[in-house]
C-alpha cells in the first residue's frame, strides 16, 4: 500500500490520504425533480447557454475536511496552481506528506504539471469514477444551484461559493459521502 510506503520513506512526517476531482458547472442549468402539490406543475426558468466554471475539490474522507476552489478552466497550468494552493492550505512539506488520489485526466498526468513538495500523486485506474470519493461531492455541491436561473457566470460562482462554505462546516456529511468502506483507515 502506498500510504505505508510513504510512512516508511518519511518516518518523521505525518502522512494523510486525500483525493481530488473537478466538476464543470455553467449557465446550462441543472434540472432536478421536485415535490409539488397534486395538479400543479413546477416550472423552472431555463435559458441554455454554454459558459462554464470549474469546481475543484480536495477532500480527506477520513475526517470530512474539504477544500474547494472555483477556477475558470481545467488544464495543467491551472491544476498546478490548484495543487500549490492546496499544499499551502494543508501545510504539506517535509513534515507533512499528502498522498493525493486522482483520476487520469490529461491535465493531471501531463509533463507540465508542477507538484509541490509534500504532495504525492496516486492515479486511479482509467475510466473508474466509482472509485473516486470526490465524485460523491458533486450532488451536494449542485444542491445550491439546481433548478435556478443565472444571468451571468459570476452569479453562479457566488452561489456555488456560498454552498461550498456551508459544506465546509459539515464534515460529517462530507465524511458520510466520501468514506468508502474499503478506503484505507490508516491516513
Locate predicted features.
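Extended, low-complexity cationic-aromatic segments
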Residues: 1-84, 180-186
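Short catalytic/ligand-binding loop motif for oxyanion handling, primarily in non-cytosolic enzymes
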Residues: 26-28, 108-110, 131-133
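RNase H-like two-metal-ion nuclease catalytic core shared by retroviral integrases
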Residues: 52, 102-104, 122-144, 153-156
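C-terminal anion-handling pockets and recognition modules
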Residues: 13-17, 134-187
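A structural preference for long, well-packed, hydrophobic secondary-structure segments
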Residues: 2-4, 9, 80-96, 123-128, ...
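A short alpha/beta connector and helix-capping loop motif
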Residues: 30-43, 112-126
Amino acid at each position: 500500500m502506498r500510504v505505508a510506503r510513504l510512512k516508511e520513506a518519511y518516518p518523521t512526517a505525518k502522512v494523510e490520504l486525500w483525493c481530488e476531482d473537478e466538476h464543470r458547472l455553467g449557465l446550462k442549468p441543472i434540472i432536478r425533480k421536485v415535490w409539488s402539490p397534486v395538479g400543479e406543475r413546477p416550472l423552472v426558468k431555463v435559458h441554455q447557454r454554454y459558459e462554464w466554471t470549474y469546481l475543484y475539490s480536495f477532500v480527506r474522507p477520513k475526517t470530512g475536511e474539504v477544500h474547494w476552489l472555483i477556477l475558470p478552466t481545467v488544464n495543467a497550468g491551472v491544476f498546478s496552481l490548484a495543487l500549490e494552493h492546496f499544499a499551502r492550505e494543508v501545510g504539506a512539506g517535509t513534515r507533512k506528506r499528502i498522498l493525493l488520489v486522482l483520476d487520469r485526466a490529461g491535465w493531471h498526468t501531463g509533463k507540465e504539471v508542477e507538484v509541490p513538495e509534500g504532495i504525492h500523486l496516486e492515479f486511479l485506474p482509467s475510466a473508474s469514477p466509482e472509485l473516486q470519493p470526490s465524485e460523491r461531492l458533486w450532488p451536494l455541491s449542485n444542491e445550491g444551484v439546481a433548478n435556478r436561473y443565472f444571468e451571468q457566470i459570476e452569479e453562479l460562482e457566488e452561489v456555488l461559493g456560498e454552498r461550498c462554505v456551508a459544506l465546509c462546516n459539515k464534515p460529517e456529511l462530507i465524511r458520510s459521502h466520501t468514506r468508502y468502506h474499503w478506503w484505507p483507515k490508516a491516513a
